[in-house]
Amino acid sequence: FYTLVLLLLIWASLYGITASGSQRWINLYFINLQPSELMKIAIIICFAKYYHRAQMYSVNKFTSIIIPIIILVLPIFLVISQPDLGTSILIALSGIMVLWLAGVNIKYFVVSGLILVITAPFVISFLQPYQKLRILSFLNPDRDPLGSGYQIIQSKIAIGSGGLFGKGFLKGTQGYLEFLPEKHTDFIFTLFSEEFGFVGSVVLLVIYIIIIYRIVAIGANSRSYFAKLFCYGFGAAIFVFITINMSTVSYTHLRAHETSLHLVCRLL
């Protein structure tokens, strides 16, 4: 599955559809496929299978670390080149979580973290100006209320206007009067909160918790190490994707396109 998705990523990078400055979709006529979304799951499956087979060896051997890193870096490089910084970060997080769950020594994560901190200024220098601006606007949306901070401000207004029980299905003003252009993806939770209010949002969170609990429980009761590792990794990934989507981090273009509501519905 990983190899297939990797080939789709290469195809998208070479012959894919370009929209909003990014070449990341494949036209299947009846739908546009974004392979980078599939890679979030493919990397979990691949790592779970790899460490299932590596049980007879030490997971902390050099080869047991370097091979997964190579497997992880290849799709990240392709996704960044599209460009899609946010999805590449989410793919990296998916892989890193499985590495941690597989029992990789904490020292590798510490060293990697130090390298990341040291190289951060160098990495930031490669960000597009609009990406830097949106990160700054996420930290302080009021600095540009009619520009890069617009959606975050409108998102807060929408959530607040939903009140306790919301305005009702398809009756949200911020969403359907186009104050939130990305309401169907980046700000889907905002739209939901406006229509169903605080109570509806809490119910949605409970549903998410139940789904994640069931996934983890299936893994805990599984006799297969592959199934156990996949379920734990998948549950952790969904939790991270939901957190990012709900915290509106996605608008900094650390995008979480369809990472919560859509991904869970499509896969489960």
Predicted regions and their residues:
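Intrinsically disordered, low-complexity Ser/Thr/Pro-rich tracts
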Residues: 115, 261-262
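Conserved small/polar residues in nucleotide/adenosyl-binding loops
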Residues: 252-259
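Hydrophobic alpha-helical segments, chiefly the membrane-spanning helices
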Residues: 263-268
